[in-house]
Regions:
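The feature captures the LRR N-terminal capping module
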Residues: 1-170, 174-178, 185-188, 201, ...
Length: 361
């Protein structure tokens, strides 16, 4: 990067932070700025609640970030961060945390101190083990750890009675804890592309379960008494690309064995009045039902979404519990008219900065 461009970018970042401090903004977007080191000025933004630092070149997270005690949303995904400070557990108000796509390899136990955390994404961080302290996150609603190197799931995770969205696809998981049915709020469970040999029967006993994705595993048979297990909310079990598909197997209206969905299942996948009510109630209760952990949607009318591509469905009518989303779709931001005006004002200053930079060089 030329000295001029670096000068302009660095001063633009500082100008954005200074405006946030002066106006006591609750939202600060510093994503996609090619930041390699978090500016120390940022730690003076004591009013900030939503801090977006994703898609940068950040290599470390200084302990000073824990001075921002009002943080409810923190996005650090798509950086080059190799460790988190133990003091991150001091961010007691944090609700949404995304650390995906960083070479972290471990989750520090202090993650369990984030007592208000509701949405936690740690996709593709080279994770080999989920710490047992995950069980302390009693308010956790959404957890994603896809594309890691996990072989087991700690039994402590099964005490998360408010967890509704669990996606652990593309790992090396060989079995699940036997008491998965303790997760009484679980709606979506995605364990596809793992190494499961036994059908996790206890998951079926989760009373709110709608979608169970087990495709691309090593399952060869359904559990004994499968038809007798009560599944009041279940919409579909995906067993495609398992050995069971190549063997004689019992047909079941809710089980998908092939690429072609049986007509009965298609009908089941169309939300009934009861399932629509379930989805609406879920969305009203918590925006993380949409897996959009940046901002709880009900607090923002007619939001403008930026730096994201989603399927176009509105917040009100989306009940897509079946499909998982990519990490790039998790950092949803909203800008008010005032915030857009501020950004435009900063942009008008850049030509002047460029002139001074030319002189300096």
């Amino acid at each position: 990067m030329s000295a001029i461009l670096k000068f302009i970018r660095e001063n633009h970042i500082l100008a954005v932070i200074e405006q946030a401090i002066a106006k006591k903004k609750s939202r600060l977007s510093l994503n996609s700025f090619e930041i390699s080191e978090i500016p120390s000025l940022l730690y003076s933004c004591l009013e900030v609640e939503h801090l977006y630092l994703h898609i940068n070149n950040i290599t470390s997270v200084p302990v000073q970030i824990t001075q921002l005690l009002n943080l409810t949303t923190l996005t650090l995904d798509y950086n080059n961060i190799s460790s988190l400070p133990a003091e991150i557990g001091n961010l007691k108000n944090l609700i949404n945390l995304n650390i995906s796509y960083n070479p972290l390899h471990i989750l520090i136990p202090e993650i369990g101190d984030l007592e208000n955390l509701e949405a936690f994404w740690c996709n593709r961080i080279g994770l080999r083990e989920i710490p047992k302290e995950i069980g302390k996150l009693s308010k956790l609603d959404t957890f994603g750890a896809r594309g890691n190197e996990l072989k087991t799931i700690p039994k402590e995770m099964t005490v998360l009675t408010k967890l509704r969205w669990l996606t652990l696809e593309y790992n090396q998981i060989e079995s699940l804890p036997p008491c998965m049915d303790n997760m009484e709020s679980l709606v979506h469970c995605n364990i596809k592309q793992n190494r499961l040999k036994e059908f996790p029967a206890s998951v079926l006993k989760c009373p709110e379960l709608m979608y169970l994705q087990l495709n691309h595993n090593q399952i060869s048979h359904l559990p004994d008494g499968f038809d007798a297990i009560p599944t009041p909310s279940l919409e579909m079990i995906d067993l495609r690309h398992n050995p069971i598909c190549e063997l004689p197997h019992p047909e079941h209206s809710l089980v998908r064995y092939t690429e072609e969905i049986p007509s009965v299942v298609v009908q089941d996948l169309t939300p009934s009045s009861s399932s629509r009510g379930h989805g609406a109630q879920a969305l009203a209760a918590n925006a993380t039902a949409l897996r959009l952990p940046a901002v709880p949607a009900p607090r923002h009318a007619d939001p403008l979404m930026i730096d994201i591509e989603i399927d176009g469905s509105s917040i009100e009518d989306s009940e897509d519990w079946e499909n998982s989303v990519n990490s790039s779709e998790l950092d949803v931001q909203y800008q008010s008219d005032d915030e857009r005006a501020d950004n435009e004002a900063v942009g008008m200053v850049l030509p002047e900065l460029s002139r001074y930079a030319t002189t300096a060089s």
